[in-house]
Amino acid sequence: MKNIQIFFLLLSFSVFSQSTFEKAEKLYAQKKYNEAEKLFSEHLKSQPNNAKTIEYLGDIAGHQKDWNTAITNYKKLKVSYPKNANYWYKYGGALGMKAKESNKFKALGMIDEVEESFLTAAKLDVKHVES
């Protein structure tokens, strides 16, 4: 009997987690980034390695021009999935935007990493739309 209760408890957590993610996706599609960010962050607590959730949080940070947060999220993804061209591309894009908004000396120090990220994305997927 106790095993059945534990099973249903775990199942309810799973259902709650999925519905949180789905709600967050809908909010993101409606460009309600602040609300979506809260739900994605909540979802990430229960599934800390969920790549799609991390990517959405990076995308939201990019929309909010929070380049440091976007970089942190995309860096996690490119390290965890080094053969995914899109993660390298997004990481390079966030770095490039941070460099653009930084002073010239700081930007100069970032250019090599931006270039490396874009070149890696292009090597991984020659048909990548934006590389």
Description of each model-found segment:
Residues 56-59, 90:
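Canonical tetratricopeptide repeat
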